[in-house]
Amino acid sequence: MKLRLLLIGLLTLITSVTFASELSHWKPLLSVDELHELLEEDPFAATVVDIRALDAKEPDASYNAGHIPGAISSPYATWRGQPDNPGKFITQDKLTWLVQALGAEADTPVVVVHRGDSYSDFGAAARVYWSLKTAGLTNLAILNGGFQAWKQAGLPISTELETPLPSDFPAQIQPHWLAQTAEVEAYLNKPGVEVLDARPDSFFAGLSWHPAASKPGTIAGAVAFDNERWFHSGGPLLESPERLQ
């Protein structure tokens, strides 16, 4: 019995050390080379979540057409609110179901992979990242450049459907990651507080708008900061840290 307990203890220690080593260079934004190296060392080092549609007519637009080996399909549409208000955060029950379907726990390293055709695809990945963080997950990252960057780097691609064992993680919405209408309204009257409108400039100016929007325009007092500015030439890759600063 003592020998068995000793072996279990050693295995636990080895697993913990390996896990800590894998996360020693973990960061919220991973390059394709960094993710590939991580998965080469251990295919189970991170849960890779592909948020593209399962099927699509356009080449490379769908999970079934090809994905990062081991990646799990979790289409972006499932992370959005109802059609009349897609920007609204999903219910806690749905959030729990989505997280458990990934087989994820609170400390599971998760990498979100978007299509990678334009900067707007990164926005979809950021929405899922935010949702997972709001659910209570702590080790999260987005693949810089998305699936297109992975493919263009000539890295392995699989067409095998991954079906992980569901977890029993009890997702709890962390309210400090959400801003309610009343809170935003209160902040608008406080000195030193800025509300940034990261939508396209045409949305801010009221020249165009989402079909679900009740009216064109922006929040009174908001500052325009089109999120396209963060990306290199309007593509899917974030600018260098030096330029972002």
Language-model features and meaning:
Residues M1-L5:
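Positively charged n-region of N-terminal signal peptides that target proteins for export
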Residues L6-S16:
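Bacterial N-terminal signal peptides
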Residues F19-Q245:
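Cytosolic catalytic domains that perform sulfur/thiol-centered chemistry
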